[in-house]
Amino acid sequence: MPIIKVRENEPFDVALRRFKRSCEKAGILAEIRRREFYEKPTTERKRAKASAVKRLAKKLTRENARRIRMY
């Protein structure tokens, strides 16, 4: 759980923004969304594998584009 200390004379908006940023860095909202509903282990593995394939395709596309620009 991200904890921030509110500084003296610090506006509430600024403290809230710092808290939101620290929550985003910790990945709390993503974790809450992921755990909102039960996901069967097979479905979880399937989703993880699909995202890995997507990441690899994206990486290869970027590398391919970089090679094309070099010539």
Swiss-Prot record:
The keyword Amino-acid biosynthesis does not apply. It comes from the Bacteria. Pfam families: Ribosomal_S21 (PF01165). GO terms for biological process: translation. PROSITE patterns: RIBOSOMAL_S21. One of its GO terms (molecular function) is structural constituent of ribosome. Transmembrane segments: none annotated. GO terms for cellular component: ribonucleoprotein complex; ribosome. InterPro entries: Ribosomal_bS21, Ribosomal_bS21_CS, Ribosomal_bS21_sf. Keywords: Ribonucleoprotein, Ribosomal protein. Belongs to the bacterial ribosomal protein bS21 family. This is Small ribosomal subunit protein bS21. It comes from Buchnera aphidicola subsp. Acyrthosiphon pisum (strain APS) (Acyrthosiphon pisum symbiotic bacterium). The gene is rpsU.
